[in-house]
Amino acid sequence: MADQVSSNPVTIVVEHLDPELGAWSALEYGCIAREAHASGSRFLLSSVPTSLQMPQDLAATQGLEVEHRSIEEVFADRKSKVCLLDPAAQVELSPADGENFEVFLFGGILGDDPPRGKLFMLHSGDEKILSLIINRPDRTSELRKKGYAGRRLGPKQMTTDTAVRVTRMVVHEKVPLEQIQYLDYPEILINEHERTEMPFRYVKGEDEQPIMPRGMIDLIKKDADHGIDDLI
């Protein structure tokens, strides 16, 4: 898609900020780590509580660096080189930002301002619709207070792994935001009677399907009849 790939290494930082780690986030972090490793990027999961025990499979994932210190401590001498991906930012992320910044910081799901949480719609054969809204802590607003330069990834809400993927495509692969192929609000078939609409924008894969973390669809299907807030 792009004519040139930046030789500058990309450092991705996700500020965890939570005392626990849900199954959803664990799959996202594993996906981010694998893709970062494959692309030669660095992935740092910061502000991880010392009391948090990482799942064994996640801890063994290539490309994952766990840091108990905060972003402010780790990059105290390079604050001007840190870019916060922020839905409230006034400037869209561009390929040139790969030369201006060294660290790209994420605080969770990115998109609507204010964020609208997660909305899952289950459609059954009798047209009954179940809507579940799960609110995550507004991590980005906390990071915004620290004064980092902000960039926006467009108007649609993205999962954390999608936001990282899009950022890497823009700043490392030099693909402008508007040239990336997306799928908005795809539906996942749960069974012959139910399907779930995902309230996010995803990158379209080579198979024309949304790119999701390995195991995510199985996780959604498994917990479709339970509290999805347990996944977050």
Model-predicted regions and their roles:
Residues 20-21, 111, 158-159:
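Glycine-/small-residue-rich active-site loops that bind phosphorylated ligands and cofactors
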Residues 25, 118, 135-139, 159-163:
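Alpha-helical interaction elements in eukaryotic regulators
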Residues 38-134:
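S-adenosyl-L-methionine/SAH cofactor-binding core of RNA-modifying enzymes
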Residues 2-48, 52, 60-66, 70-71, ...:
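Core subunits and conserved enzymes of cellular information-processing
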Residues 27-32, 95-97, 142:
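A short acidic, amphipathic alpha-helical/loop segment
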Residues 140-190:
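Structured adenosyl-cofactor binding patch, chiefly the S-adenosyl-L-methionine
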Residues 124-150:
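Hydrophobic/aromatic-rich, well-ordered segments within soluble, folded domains that form packed cores
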Residues 15, 107, 123, 151-159:
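Short beta->alpha connector loops at strand-helix junctions that form conserved
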